[in-house]
């Protein structure tokens, strides 16, 4: 897993395979961190967008 900044209020999570991406997206969808605005899944990534930069650490913990 690799975390890449994506602007002031988002982080892109890169995963090794589709299975990992599905599990992460499901978990984040069922138990979103406070301030999560959007989750954008792709082939092996999930973009996590939050309301404020202060909320990023909780979103990726």
List PLM regions with ranges.
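Conserved "landmark" site that anchors the functional core of diverse proteins
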Residues: 1-61
